[in-house]
Each structure stands twice: as C-alpha cells, then as structure tokens.
Amino acid sequence: MDRFRMLFQHLQSSSESVMNGICLLLAAVTVKIYSSLDFNCPCLERYNALYGLGLLLTPPLALFLCGLLVNRQSVLMVEEWRRPAGHRRKDLGIIRYMCSSVLQRALAAPLVWILLALLDGKCFVCAFSNSVDPEKFLDFANMTPRQVQLFLAKVPCKEDELVKNSPARKAVSRYLRCLSQAIGWSITLLVIVVAFLARCLRPCFDQTVFLQRRYWSNYMDLEQKLFDETCCEHARDFAHRCVLHFFANMQSELRALGLRRDPAGGIPESQESSEPPELREDRDSGNGKAHLRAISSREQVDQLLSTWYSSKPPLDLAASPRRWGPGLNHRAPIAAPGTKLCHQLNV
C-alpha cells in the first residue's frame, strides 16, 4: 500500500510522469479496442479501399486528437505562444520543446494502432486487394479483366462462394498480408532505432539548452497550477468574508429595529463588537492571507486577472513591482468590518 501511495504522490508532483502515464493508458486502450474490433470488409470494388484505409487511418487520427486533449502542456503551449509579451519575453525555444514533447506523447497511441493493423494485415488486404497486379499470379490467365477485378474484390471475404477454397485467393491474401507485415516490422524497427539513437547520442552533446528548456516548461506548468490554486483559495476566502459581512450587517439592522434579544446573563449589547469573530481572528492571527485580502472587490479581481493575462510579471523576484505595469493602482477602498461590503462587491 505504501508503494502505491508513493507512486501516486510522485505522479501528482511530476507533470511529465502524469503525461507518460496517460500516454501508456491510451496505448493500452488502443490495443484493447483493436482486439475487440469486428472487422468486416465490404468486398466491393469501390468500397474496399475506402473501408480499409479508413479503418487504418481514422482511429489513429481520433487517438491523436485525444492525446492532445488530455495533455495539459498542449494548452499551455498555445497560451504561451499567443499571450501578450507584457513584462515577460516569450522564448520560442521553450515553445518548440513543449511542442515536441506534446507531439511525441500524442503520437504514441496512433502509432500503436497503425502497427497493430499492419501486423494483423486485414486492413491492408481489404484496402489493396484491387490493386494487385494479376500478372504475378498464374491463376488469372483464363479470366477476363472484368472477372479478375471482381475476383480481387472478393479476396478479403474467404467465405464468399466466388473465392471459397480458391488457391488464387489464398495466394493474393498471403502476398498482401506478408507485404503488410513487412511494412509494419520496418516501421517498428525504424522507431526503435530512432529512439535508441536519440537516447544514446543526447548525452554526447551540450545539455545546457535542453536543461533550460525543460526547466522552464515545467515552471510554466507549475506556475499555472499554483495560480489556479491561489485563485480558488481567494474565491473561497472572498465568499466567506462576504457572507460574514452580510450576517454582521443583518445583526446591525436587527439591533436597530429592536428585534435582537440579549441572551440571559450574557454580555451587554453595547459591549459587544460588531466585527464578526472569524474576521477578527483572521486579522489578528497573521496567517499569511494578507495578499489575498487586499483584493476585496469585483473590479480589483477583474483587474488582477486581466493583468495576469496581458502583463505577466518578469521572472525576477528582485524587480520592483512598480515596473510590472499599472497592476492594481486603482483599487477600490477596502471596507471596514461591519459595513455593507456585500452590496459593494456586486457578486
């Protein structure tokens, strides 16, 4: 159990591990889908190629799009490419690195499907049975061209009466299946050789640029996650404060209307503070939320989000905040506790 917990924590802390896990999951789903696929070639001249090539290429396209959708870095890459420069320059090298990483993971599942289809050979036989040269086979010598085309169209359907138990059908099917498997194994070997060379030759070159681009691509992912988490934290605190101010205002109104009753033996009403205890505790505890409480109106939140998109701060913690642009210079005043802040928030 501890091993699974450690593995889960590692996947949560590493975006690359999560993406690799999703990539492997898509590949496994691809194998499962193909193994459960019911392949039925139409065995018609005009539709064999359309059906065979469609089954060979359409699912890989869908799997490629799924790979792009589930990869968080694909969205970050487009956002980084299209965002305004602001106070942070855009590095095209990082964008190219992210694009390469996204494409490598998105192409894994489609490649698995294509290799399975080629090694199985059914799609290839259906798609190219009409393209076989009849002169390579002696059994077609006594047939007219029209009979040959009709016969070749029926090759994928071994139970058809026209080609059942025909040596010519077996020869054509065997020829196309061998050709399909040869192409599949060639692609497999090529992919393995390219991956082997990339892994073995990369340490032979300077790793500085690679490490920099990998670092900053991970940084952008983590930065966006932390920004989203901080926004959720601020939204929760914002809603909490608004509700507390609403109850505090209602308490004051009820007191003004004389509808509030003092508890027996309690503290006199004149000695009670109108400030909600939750706000007083948060203000005095110094729990590190002052940077969140400074944003206390809808206009300030909108300005903050707009500034984050249009003018991200520079990657220099020593830089003065005044150099980051207008930011939140025109913030609305923060209302004191007990006032009607919930009417000012307009949320």
From Swiss-Prot:
Tissue-specificity statement = Expressed in taste bud cells.
User: Keywords on this record?
Assistant: Calcium, Calcium channel, Calcium transport, Cell membrane, Disulfide bond, Glycoprotein, Ion channel, Ion transport, Lipoprotein, Membrane, Palmitate, Sensory transduction, Taste, Transmembrane, Transmembrane helix, Transport
Bias (Basic and acidic residues): 277-286
Main location as per UniProt:
membrane
The protein's matches in Pfam families, at most eight in alphabetical order, are given as: Ca_hom_mod (PF14798)
Statement: the UniProt record of this protein carries the keyword Transmembrane? yes
Q: What GO cellular component term, any one, is given? A: plasma membrane
- Where, by residue number, does the polypeptide cross the bilayer? 21-36, 49-71, 99-124, 177-202
What top-level branch of life does the organism fall under? Eukaryota
Q: What ranges are annotated Cytoplasmic (topological domains)?
A: 1-20, 72-98, 203-347
Q: Name one GO molecular function term.
A: voltage-gated channel activity
Outcome of altering N142Q? Answer: Loss of N-glycosylation. Reduces channel conductance. Does not affect channel trafficking to plasma membrane
* Cell division found in the keyword field: no
Per the record, the GO terms for biological process are: ATP export; ATP transport; protein heterooligomerization; sensory perception of taste
Disulfide pairs here are C41-C126, C43-C157
Q: Per the record, which residues fall in region Central pore?
A: 9-36
Which residues face the membrane's Extracellular side?
37-48, 125-176
Q: Provide the topology term for how it sits in the membrane.
A: Multi-pass membrane protein
**Entry-listed glycosylation sites:** N142
Q: Which family does it belong to?
A: Belongs to the CALHM family.
What is this protein's function per UniProt? Pore-forming subunit of gustatory voltage-gated ion channels required for sensory perception of sweet, bitter and umami tastes. With CALHM1 forms a fast-activating voltage-gated ATP-release channel in type II taste bud cells, ATP acting as a neurotransmitter to activate afferent neural gustatory pathways. Acts both as a voltage-gated and calcium-activated ion channel: mediates neuronal excitability in response to membrane depolarization and low extracellular Ca(2+) concentration.
The protein in question is named Calcium homeostasis modulator protein 3
Q: What gene name is given for the protein in this entry?
A: Calhm3
